Amino acid sequence: MSAILKQRVRYAPYLKKLRTGEQCIDLFKHGQYLGWSGFTGVGAPKVIPTTLVDHVEKNNLQGKLGFHLFVGASAGPEESRWAENNMILTRAPHQVGKPIAAAINDGRTQFFDKHLSMFPQDLTYGFYTKDKPNGSNLDYTIIEATAITEDGSIVPGPAVGASPEMISVSDKIIIEVNTKTPSFEGIHDIDMPVNPPFRQPYPHTSADFKIGKTAIPVDPEKVVAIVESTSGDKVPPNTPSDEQSRGIANHLIEFLEHEVKQGRLPANLHPLQSGIGNIANAVVEGLASSNFKNLTVWTEVLQDSFLDFFESGSLDYATATSIRLTNDGFKKFYDNWDTYSKKLCLRSQVVSNSPEIIRRLGVIAMNTPVEVDIYGHANSTNVMGSRMLNGLGGSADFLRNAKLSIMHTPSARPSKVDPTGLSCIVPMASHVDQTEHDLDVVVTEQGLADLRGLAPKARAKVIIDKCSHPDYKPQLQEYYDRSVFYATKKKTLHEPHILRDVFKMHLNFQENGTMKLDSWDQKF
């Protein structure tokens, strides 16, 4: 037992349950229902998942030792190895990584995505274990901790996610105490699940409001093993902003400045929500260098750019369920713990993504889709309507309930044969996650379309005019004009479409590698 482990585990009875990963292998059987801590690749268990996949590889047990796996969102690289070894029978509600996506799209893993605010509560309702043959609880939850308090409660690390709910509905719990990661004690605010009809309103009225519980309570009798973990989180470098993403950010900031001038937003805006990726980075960079001050953030995930945002002096406070930093970012965070720990809070995902709180605070939500159609429907998950990327995540939690719901995307993306082979503005989205009723603004590097108060045909005109790529604008305009002509004859002018043509851009991409049509009369 290392000295630092003994220091971190302040509940002495747990030290009698100290095990190695190998000593835990026999606890696991094919078909069990497992919960993991973690969110967006940080705070997930490492020792037990790695030990189990090593065991499968060593003994050729691929397909013979598989599990129903639940994680708050995406886990770390350990999940990729599980997917490569056919160890994931079912998975929810969100994932990231080529191996797990391949397993889903090959049909080896059954995946269901769900709004991240709803997934943990639905787990406590028994929705995901209703067909489990031996009870409705998870068999095991494996949770990473950075400390354990005197009463046995768990202090998470850089992610809270769905851990409180998983622990509450788990038969047995394994705690991995990560002694590589500094203790995060004091930075969390934990709400434990209370199911209807006893659930009370959330009292949060500002981004910095706290309930005051800094650790996850647990029944010590359920804890069957304590395992020391000495591996840190492995987060790949962030995608840097580029000219295109900075163009999108500039349009957005100009729009927000206009909203302030018109009196629709206060000078320090409302709490901001932003995803991850180069567009989100560019937006954060743009806000940090703008004239906005005393800003707050209410979001799912904080990444490296938020540390610079704090340092700019523009950001007062940020709250999320995960702080997903690179190695350099974590070092900077730990080196300045006294500064950052006073300015941010990590909460469970049912709180960070709560529709009630998002609506009350008037959050400004900004997310990136796969595609947006001319009437304002957005696809966030399924490429060409069928191939799963990562899952819905929390985008709809925010976009359905925010004061301003913004989708930002490049106007076009490259394909293998055409540098603008994929238009992100299409006649009809091949899959719909956010409806026309949810979005207020669509923005690309070409421009910004303000959709508020517009009927469908007016939305189509402004989206085509402001957001589409020049390579596609005439083609999209022609589709719209033909649809209006057709719908006029049919007296179906509310939201004009020609169903025989509406997916021709997608079909042409599948056949020819580009969405550029020779003609709308082209046959497929």
UniProtKB/Swiss-Prot annotation:
Segments traversing the membrane: none
Main location: cytoplasm
Protein name: Acetyl-CoA hydrolase
Function: Presumably involved in regulating the intracellular acetyl-CoA pool for fatty acid and cholesterol synthesis and fatty acid oxidation.
Family membership: Belongs to the acetyl-CoA hydrolase/transferase family.
Subcellular location: Cytoplasm
EC number assigned by the record: 3.1.2.1
GO cellular component, one term: mitochondrion
GO molecular function: acetate CoA-transferase activity; acetyl-CoA hydrolase activity
Organism: Candida albicans (strain SC5314 / ATCC MYA-2876) (Yeast)
Keywords: Cytoplasm, Hydrolase
Keyword Transcription: no
InterPro entries: AcetylCoA_hyd_C, AcetylCoA_hyd_C_sf, ActCoA_hydro, ActCoA_hydro_N, NagB/RpiA_transferase-like
GN (gene name): ACH1
Classification via Pfam families: AcetylCoA_hyd_C (PF13336), AcetylCoA_hydro (PF02550)
Binding residues annotated for CoA, in chain numbering: 275-279, 390, 394
Catalysed reactions, semicolon-separated: acetyl-CoA + H2O = acetate + CoA + H(+)
One of the GO biological process terms: cellular response to alkaline pH
Catalytic center residues: 300
Something else known: Has antigenic properties. Elicits a specific immune response in systemic candidiasis human patients undergoing malignant hematological disorders.
